[in-house]
Amino acid sequence: MINAVDLHKVYQLKGREVVALRGVSLHVPQGEIYGVVGPSGAGKSTLLRCINLLERPDRGEIWVDGRNLTALPPPQLRAARRGIGMIHQHFALLSSRTVAGNVAFPLEIAGVPRAERRRRVAELLELVGLADKAAAYPAQLSGGQKQRVGIARALAPRPTVLLSDEATSALDPATTASILDLLRDLNRELGLTILLITHEMDVVKRICDAVAIMDRGSVVETGRTVDLLRTPGSLLARSLFAPPPVSGDGVVTLTWVDQAEEPLISQLTRLFDVDVSILGGALEEVAGHAVGRLTVRITGERSAEALTYLTDRNVLVEEVP
């Protein structure tokens, strides 16, 4: 659905070059929610602006829905952009227009007849849970409600792709959770492909099917969210989970997915006659999966066999130095 191929982007700033993107490539399958995370200045927002060609990359290609946007002439590019919606951290609503008027605005620009606009606006406000706010003005809305208006407006032209640039970073935790739940519902109901930029790991944990981690203009890690958590040395796992509370001989971290009901620790003590001390741990829901992580100290003559037993059962075992 979205393919970014070897993107490069350099800005000129006060007589010096600032490299924003260094050969960035990523693939977002149709119907997935794909997160791009990283620190400020990593190139995340530049990447997003290149996807819909608000910024044109110096080198590389952008493919959306089978079309190379970087090769399209202006009239065709404008038409292709109608299939790409975008929501922002700052809602950019028109204060002089009602909620319904804001949602209708892109349809007016596109020349959609008034009766059809009204039907579409009513449908969208129902979809985002604001059917009773059609006549309200932005100043009368909460931050979460304003973002819902922004989402409805982005969906007005019936896009197949939604780009989200830090859309929840200005919201409180409860409102953030409700917006993320809405995005997940839209993804499922409409088959919407969502590419979201965030610096919040809780966003990745809650809704992202796959993720790319960026740093200094490059993608340094990418893959399915759950698969990365089972990958030794994963940057994502280090970011999502607190570091082990202790280290030393026999101390390991155990990570497993969707195995919370298996009595793995009691099996170890029973089968291999080892002592297992639990030093810390957590059970989190990540991308719809139950992911567990324990830090334990295993001692006994058969401790190596016990660790092999865990590995054979798809538990990631990592020594804590």
Curated annotation (Swiss-Prot):
Superkingdom of the source species: Bacteria
EC number: 7.4.2.11
GO cellular component: plasma membrane
Reactions listed under catalytic activity: L-methionine(out) + ATP + H2O = L-methionine(in) + ADP + phosphate + H(+); D-methionine(out) + ATP + H2O = D-methionine(in) + ADP + phosphate + H(+)
ABC transporter domain ranges (all copies): 2-241
Classification via InterPro entries: AAA+_ATPase (IPR003593), ABC_transporter-like_ATP-bd (IPR003439), ABC_transporter-like_CS (IPR017871), ACT-like_dom_sf (IPR045865), MetN_ABC (IPR041701), MetN_ABC_transporter-like (IPR050086), NIL_domain (IPR018449), P-loop_NTPase (IPR027417)
Location in the cell: Cell membrane
Pfam families: ABC_tran (PF00005), NIL (PF09383)
Top enzyme class: translocase
Molecular function via GO: ABC-type D-methionine transporter activity; ATP binding; ATP hydrolysis activity
Record membrane topology: Peripheral membrane protein
SMART domains, sorted: AAA (SM00382), NIL (SM00930)
Protein residues bound to ATP: G38, P39, S40, G41, A42, G43, K44, S45
Main location class: membrane
Keywords, ordered alphabetically: Amino-acid transport, ATP-binding, Cell membrane, Membrane, Nucleotide-binding, Translocase, Transport
Role of this protein: Part of the ABC transporter complex MetNIQ involved in methionine import. Responsible for energy coupling to the transport system.
UniProt similarity note: Belongs to the ABC transporter superfamily. Methionine importer (TC 3.A.1.24) family.
Binding partners and assembly: The complex is composed of two ATP-binding proteins (MetN), two transmembrane proteins (MetI) and a solute-binding protein (MetQ).
Name of protein: Methionine import ATP-binding protein MetN
Species name: Thermobifida fusca (strain YX)
Lineage of the organism: Bacteria, Bacillati, Actinomycetota, Actinomycetes, Streptosporangiales
Gene: metN
